[in-house]
């Protein structure tokens, strides 16, 4: 409308400016008229145009009215459709939300059911697996026992075998069912997850549709509310909006249809899931029923097994009773046979008597006939005959009674033989039955034992191979490094000796030229007087020096094999330059230099002319060397006075130059021999290195040269050399050796000599004098204070009474060196050439030195952490009693007590190679004991006898176990090196596995034996004295041995049964301390039959008297039996007492 008004204004408004009349000049009248006409014409034309436009607008209005009517009709129609569609929409949304809530609740319930089904399925699976394991484990044994037990009843065997087969098939069926159910559950869970995702998406779409419908409804309401006049633009906008609303309604229709379809699909899927869940529940119910049936079958099998076990126990008891009855019957049979033999002898005697009486009767009849013939009329003869006839009738009656007795005895013997045959038949049947039972049990046990032994052998073989390879590698490395050090040291010695030879040759040349010049010139008179005055002293000194010089090569080279003298600590310092020289070692170096200079100066100053010439020809030593020489000459080293006088007076004394030349020539010969020996040693070292490279995987042994941790090694300790795992004694040849595991090794003698090669130590007088002169270095340890000083005094430290006792122990050990030599022959040093007597003397000296090391360390109360390597090795060998291979491994790996005390159980196994846990326990307990003994802050222990080593593993195995009646375990105890300090630390597992003590009663016997040792404070002497005191008196039952109990049984008149106590584990401590061990248990151990009532009553009477006397003495306040039993059980480790 605004557009049409604008056009009207444009058409009506003239283009003539109205202000022109006022502003212009005067207008003429004709122009005014023309203008008016023109104006009228224009107005008419404008009116025509306006009418046309009005008609056009009327037409347009009519058209618009028609359009609006049509639009209103369409709007009404759309509104009715919208109302139709939206009329049921809120109810459907509510129903859909309720259905969604129900579906969610159902899904949660199904999830819970699924979780429960999973748990139950897992439980059933575990139960089935357990049942399968049980059946597979016991199938063979059950089948064998069933076949043996019911060999005649084939129906029972087949039924049980079928039960086993059915169980197996049931297991397989349930496995397959589990797999199927698991697969179905996985598929159903996947479908539920997808459906939940679809539901969430559809819910989002429904919410968006609801929002759109709400917006469209609001717009429609706004459109209906606004009934304002509608022009062309409004009608177009409403038309567009209606079109959009129609499209949106179409989309909503399609989306609602799709959502309905999806909801129907979801309901169908839920129905399917419910069906699957019901099927799973039915399968679960069936599985539970099968499990119940299996449980019932298992209970039946357990009942059958318990029934079989009870039957086996009853059979065993019957067998034992039958065995005891058979022994009793045998004893009765022996008695009856003995009585029968006596009766036979009596019958023979009676027969002989009857025969003699018949002979006498015949003689009497003959005499009677003769007498009747001679004197029939004599009454006295008749009376006499009458008496003789009466005697004969009495003899006949006696013979008849003897025959009757013989017949009765025959009948009794026949009855007893019949009873004996019946008893033998019963015994044979019992033996056959027990043999069948024992064969089945033995087969089962042997099969399991074979499997365990095979597995154990494989593990032990792998472990042994690993340990052997590591030890071979370590030993080879050490020997190779040692050979390299020997080679370097020999090269250095060779070079130094070559330089010394060159210097001596130069000095000899200078001496000879000086001698030649002295002969060319005259000798001054004043000098000759000095020669006359000093000649005797110089000659004596020269002779003594010459003798000493001559003795030195003899001392040095009298050893076998022409080996050069060992330099002891100096060679060790040359091998290892990192070691610190002490003050005494530095003085010893200076002393050697001064000794060489003194020898050369003494040789050069022997002639009178050489004193003057030597000052010009010989190079003077520096002042430091001169002071060292003066110190050596004046320090009182112990040189002979003649030698000192010769060295002091030789500067001005005269002597034949030939003596000087011979001395120098001897010195050169000795140096040449030194050079040859050094070359020989170098050759040995090279050959050893080559052989070690070739045989590094076949031969391993300890290095031949061992360094010392003390600053000065004594001669005995320097000569002590031991191969790491050599177990041969010193008097056995080196052709055959044994490795650590006892396997023989055949080694070439040449290789043994090369590996054992060590330059021996040659003692000259300067060595001994220096040892007397030197004081102990501050760096030396207390344990090595006895090394070096051969005759020096030792300081006695004030120690406690316990350590004084330890000193007496080691003094006592020194007196019994021969016994130690016999017992510890495996610990001897490496094989050396020489006689057997010299080897034993060297061994005794080495043992004495080890005892001195330990005694000195204990007297000085040196803490165990400060002990050095040799003292720790001596302690392991003499105190702990470890085998030679463990001692050698400790010598190679442990250099101090601190290292030893810091070793853990794993490090002991890895570094020292102790694989047996009881051996490691022995070492750890010994270390703890020594640390507590030597610690200054630790209190004194009351059980010092443990430390003395009196109850070592040899005493435990050879003496103590037989006294307990457990001699059958001696080999296991000796293999485990079990000593007294280990007894309280044994567990039940150690007794069963390592000591092979499976019998519960034997373990109980061992426990009460340990309690007896506790009561005597582990004192072997006290125990022996108490046993000796009660040897012939029935007192002190606590210390009775198994043999003493047997003698007591013989004393009470039951000697027939005493042999049954051998290896039974019955001793005095068990009888005295175990209150559950009564007379019936003792009779059972003695194998006295239950029908032998008199012997049982006798044993019970004597046993009660013996035990009551002891228990009244030991326990004045008796308690109840249960409390005493609990106290006895609650000891250091658990035992099941004998019942």
From Swiss-Prot:
It is found in: Synapse. PROSITE patterns: SAM_DOMAIN. Residues 867-933, 952-1016, 1040-1109 form the SAM domain. Its main location: other. Keywords: Coiled coil, Repeat, Synapse. Detected in vulval muscle and other cells near the vulva; in neurons located in the lateral ganglion, posterior ganglion, ventral cord and lateral body; and in pharyngeal and body wall muscle cells. This is Liprin-alpha. It comes from Caenorhabditis elegans.
